[in-house]
């Protein structure tokens, strides 16, 4: 069966700095009309940095939509224009943590909320780390947090970390065997 829904008309309701909201008139595979609310997003990256000792560097920051301060991997949105995912990941890693990486190992692409948003989030594992100075954006207030990878696994396992990109990055690192001896077995 072909599950494709055909777009009939797009009605843009809001155009912001990081997203656009539209309401589409569409046609279901059976020919019946429907309405689809869509949030267009620039896309972004998330980077899980793991050093040679199995330590990870995360960021703690307030996330306004949830009204909570959370712990997550360094991340950010893609800039308008030609910036590729790896370049964006390197930029965000340095801005938020001061780290630069010899290697940016792709962990894949995830779609955080495909039911209403077209955001594509590219995940990386950063290796060969060198510490430098942070350069946070003007509106960004973050704290660097270092911990063993095994401790991060425990925070994911218990649900203390709810951030989807962080959970996905930890899972991909484990599945791809990129944690080395710092895996979660001892937790």
Language model region names:
Residues 9-46, 52-53:
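Acidic, metal-coordinating catalytic segment for phosphate/diphosphate chemistry
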Residues 20-24, 69, 120-122, 143:
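Short beta-strand micro-motifs in enzyme catalytic cores
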Residues 1-11:
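A short, amphipathic edge element
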Residues 175-187:
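Generic C-terminal helix-cap and adjacent flexible tail
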Residues 34, 43-46, 77-164:
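Unchanged
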Residues 170:
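C-terminal boundary of histidine-terminating zinc-finger modules
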Residues 29-30, 51-53, 62, 126-131, ...:
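Short loop segments at secondary-structure junctions
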Residues 2, 48-91, 134, 187:
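Conserved Nudix-box catalytic region and its N-terminal flanking loop in Nudix hydrolases
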């Amino acid at each position: 069966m072909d599950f494709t829904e055909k777009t009939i008309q797009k009605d843009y309701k809001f155009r912001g700095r990081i997203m656009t909201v539209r309401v589409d008139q569409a046609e279901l595979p059976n020919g019946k009309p429907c309405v689809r609310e869509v949030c267009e997003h620039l896309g972004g990256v998330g980077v899980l940095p793991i050093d040679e000792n199995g330590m990870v560097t995360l960021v703690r920051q307030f996330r306004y939509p949830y009204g909570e301060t959370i712990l997550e991997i360094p991340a950010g949105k893609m800039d308008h224009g030609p910036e590729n995912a790896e370049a964006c990941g390197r930029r965000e890693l340095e801005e938020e943590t001061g780290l630069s990486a010899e290697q940016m190992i792709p962990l894949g692409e995830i779609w955080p909320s495909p039911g209403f948003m077209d955001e594509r989030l590219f995940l990386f594992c950063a290796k060969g780390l060198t510490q430098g100075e942070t350069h946070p954006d003007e509106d960004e207030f973050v704290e660097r947090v270092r911990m063993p990878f095994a401790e991060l696994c425990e925070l994911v396992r218990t649900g203390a970390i709810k951030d989807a990109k962080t959970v996905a990055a930890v899972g991909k690192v484990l599945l791809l065997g990129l944690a080395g001896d710092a895996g979660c077995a001892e937790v």
